[in-house]
């Protein structure tokens, strides 16, 4: 099967794409990136829906969001006042790289067919 490029991803270097895909090796980070893709507003760790559903502690979610930001998939837009003492919650938005990587993942998933292992033939 030949890959048909629908968008121009040349604005991203191979190193940027490799770093982005490497950080997405954790399923929680893919879930987080998807949450940002459907949000119209910046999100903080406590805003990410799977955190409550899966009972993932906020510090763990913050760590994963920070890794996504370091890989260039998210961009911090500043702290949000929580109205309570303590560390302010950082809010993030999806970057162009994050959007493009999600589109590449979606395209790959939509066009891939399950492979049978050589042992099952």
Question: What positions do the PLM features span?
Answer:
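The DNA-recognition helices of helix-turn-helix-type DNA-binding domains
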Residues: 39-40, 52-55, 68, 81, ...
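Amphipathic alpha-helical dimerization/coiled-coil segments
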Residues: 1-16, 34-39, 86, 93-121
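Beta-hairpin "wing" of winged helix-turn-helix
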Residues: 69-87
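Short, glycine/charged-enriched secondary-structure capping and boundary segments
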Residues: 63, 76, 89, 107-108
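Short, hydrophobic-biased segments on the C-terminal half of alpha helices
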Residues: 62-69
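N-terminal helix-turn-helix DNA-binding core of bacterial DNA-binding proteins
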Residues: 16-56
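Key DNA-contact positions within bacterial/archaeal DNA-binding proteins
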Residues: 59
